């Protein structure tokens, strides 16, 4: 497995298994299959509605939690300090873990400043190993970077032939 080292020294696998659009009733089986063929980085999100299936797979796979790099994202309906804190605790409960390897703000909408403050607190408490953002354009990324006490470790951006993200790449 190849890794990238984040800005805080945490090593993240370059290849991960994402469960976007995986129906909740299929998530456990799909993640168990992914683990069986060697995936150790699992990417989910509150908005996907399948965190519980990921947690069930991790609990049933027979491997220790430390073998995995687990990522989830705070959805825009949970933006703001208090709502984000509650949603992070809820995500950890659904995932069956007492820590996350990476937590991202899913999109730059709502009070993402409050969301990021909540994430920083979890990071400082040792409940999150790395924090960052997702789908932030260069302007929003610079904004949060200047606001943050803890710089984002990553800006996860969807990239494919139909969405090439040329501006984000140039930045």
PLM regions and their residue ranges:
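Glycine/small-residue-rich loop that forms an oxyanion/phosphate-binding "nest" at active or ligand-binding sites
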Residues: 73-121
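Short, acidic/polar
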Residues: 22-35, 79-95, 114, 139-143, ...
């Amino acid at each position: 497995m190849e890794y990238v080292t984040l800005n805080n020294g945490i090593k993240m696998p370059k290849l991960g298994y994402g469960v976007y659009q995986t129906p909740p009733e299929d998530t456990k089986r799909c993640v168990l299959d992914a683990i069986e063929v060697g995936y150790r980085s699992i990417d989910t999100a509150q908005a996907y509605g399948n965190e519980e299936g990921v947690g069930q797979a991790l609990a049933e796979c027979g491997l220790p939690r430390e073998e995995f790099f687990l990522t989830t994202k705070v959805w825009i309906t949970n933006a703001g300090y208090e709502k984000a804190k509650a949603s992070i605790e809820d995500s950890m409960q659904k995932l069956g873990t007492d820590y996350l390897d990476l937590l991202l703000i899913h999109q730059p909408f709502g009070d993402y400043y409050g969301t990021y403050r909540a994430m920083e607190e979890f990071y400082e408490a040792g409940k999150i190993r790395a924090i960052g953002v997702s789908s932030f354009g260069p302007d929003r990324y610079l904004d949060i970077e200047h606001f943050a006490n803890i710089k984002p470790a990553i800006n996860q951006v969807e990239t494919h032939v139909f969405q090439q993200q040329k501006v984000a790449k140039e930045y």
